[in-house]
């Protein structure tokens, strides 16, 4: 039985429910503000800042999660393998004192880091800088020796000039009802996606070739789970070890039911506990009434390490994209540095 603490999304965003008239009115105001802001950057009325190294921005057009952070982590890992020294810029959503720029280490207190920057630092071991001004974060990373900046989220942060834009799309929900906030989930009009260099569809059916779309095409990404990692120590176990068992499954992410479904597909008996996205956990949150293993996403695990016991396990997501996607991405980077 779910804890019922997950986020509430308006039914009209993704369902067949009519949009309330007041929300349509507010959408018109929001659309005007978005258009004026873009015009200000395009005409030079608002200044943009660049850095002397390639900048890759990974983001989305809709409010809420689409799988950006797992893709960010995978891209950083691939860049390292190719000899780059990537640095990651992030806003650090939900952290205390959000206006203070900060370097994030794997052991930075979660309330100072924000959950996603903390997870990126933990999983990559690379430099992570949080700053509401991502252009300032990029400059700080370059000053520390990074030769490429990867921006986790920030598609709408036009203050930072970028070389490559990657839009991540929920392959199931796509753009919902197609309306802008607050009438729908869109931060910007759908046409904005045509300007991105790559579009990655999360949870779409896997293909080794791009589907019809813009630029290099719509690349389809799959997320896999195959092992668990103890939050205490380095003990790693196959996920099959929990097949046929009941576990407490914890997810404080945009779409917790997808994590629960992935576990069920592996034959695991799931007792689901959905929390709001970006929820900061306390030990009291895990008073479930039954002593079972606790399986959670990496994004949740990074916030539970301080009080976790031997029954707590993270379930890392493994990102799978076509080989041709990586070839196209690195070809683009090579062209940038050779100019």
UniProtKB/Swiss-Prot annotation:
InterPro entries: LpxK, P-loop_NTPase
Enzyme class: transferase
EC number: 2.7.1.130
Gene Ontology CC, one term: plasma membrane
Catalysed conversion reaction: a lipid A disaccharide + ATP = a lipid IVA + ADP + H(+)
Residues noted as binding ATP in the record, renumbered to the chain: 62-69
Pathway info: Glycolipid biosynthesis; lipid IV(A) biosynthesis; lipid IV(A) from (3R)-3-hydroxytetradecanoyl-[acyl-carrier-protein] and UDP-N-acetyl-alpha-D-glucosamine: step 6/6
Pfam families (alphabetical): LpxK
Recorded GO MF terms: ATP binding; tetraacyldisaccharide 4'-kinase activity
Spans traversing the lipid bilayer: none
Domain of life: Bacteria
GO BP annotations listed: lipid A biosynthetic process; lipopolysaccharide core region biosynthetic process
Record keywords, A-Z: ATP-binding, Kinase, Lipid A biosynthesis, Lipid biosynthesis, Lipid metabolism, Nucleotide-binding, Transferase
Family, similarity comment: Belongs to the LpxK family.
Purpose of the protein: Transfers the gamma-phosphate of ATP to the 4'-position of a tetraacyldisaccharide 1-phosphate intermediate (termed DS-1-P) to form tetraacyldisaccharide 1,4'-bis-phosphate (lipid IVA).
Name by which UniProt lists this protein: Tetraacyldisaccharide 4'-kinase
């Amino acid at each position: 039985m779910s804890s019922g603490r997950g986020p509430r999304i308006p039914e009209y965003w993704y369902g067949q429910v009519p949009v309330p008239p007041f929300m349509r009115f507010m959408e018109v105001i929001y659309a005007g503000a978005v258009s004026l802001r873009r015009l200000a950057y395009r005409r030079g009325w608002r200044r943009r800042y660049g850095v002397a190294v390639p900048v890759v921005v990974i983001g989305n057009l809709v409010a809420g999660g689409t799988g950006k952070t797992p893709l960010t982590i995978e891209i950083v890992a691939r860049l390292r393998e190719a000899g780059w020294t990537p640095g990651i810029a992030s806003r650090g959503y939900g952290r205390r004192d959000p206006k203070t720029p900060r370097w994030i280490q794997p052991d930075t207190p979660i309330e100072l880091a924000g959950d996603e920057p903390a997870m990126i630092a933990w999983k990559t071991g690379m430099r992570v800088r949080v700053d509401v001004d991502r252009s300032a974060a990029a400059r700080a990373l370059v000053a520390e020796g990074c030769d490429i900046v990867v921006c986790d989220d920030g598609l709408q942060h036009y203050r930072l000039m970028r070389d490559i834009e990657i839009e991540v799309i929920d392959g199931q929900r796509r753009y919902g009802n197609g309306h802008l906030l607050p009438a729908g989930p869109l931060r910007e009009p759908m046409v904005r996606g045509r300007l991105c260099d790559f579009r990655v569809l999360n949870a779409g059916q896997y293909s080794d070739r791009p589907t019809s779309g813009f630029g290099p095409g719509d690349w389809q990404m799959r997320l896999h789970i195959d092992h668990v990692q103890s939050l205490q120590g380095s003990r790693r176990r196959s996920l099959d070890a929990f097949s046929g068992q009941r576990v407490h499954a914890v997810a404080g992410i945009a779409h917790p039911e997808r994590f629960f479904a992935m576990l069920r597909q592996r034959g695991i008996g799931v007792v689901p506990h959905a929390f709001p996205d970006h929820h900061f956990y306390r030990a009291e949150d895990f008073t479930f009434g039954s002593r079972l293993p606790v399986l959670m996403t990496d994004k949740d695990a990074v916030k539970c390490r301080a009080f976790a016991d031997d029954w707590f396990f993270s379930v890392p997501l493994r990102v799978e994209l076509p080989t041709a996607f990586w070839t196209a991405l690195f070809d683009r980077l090579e062209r940038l540095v050779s100019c």
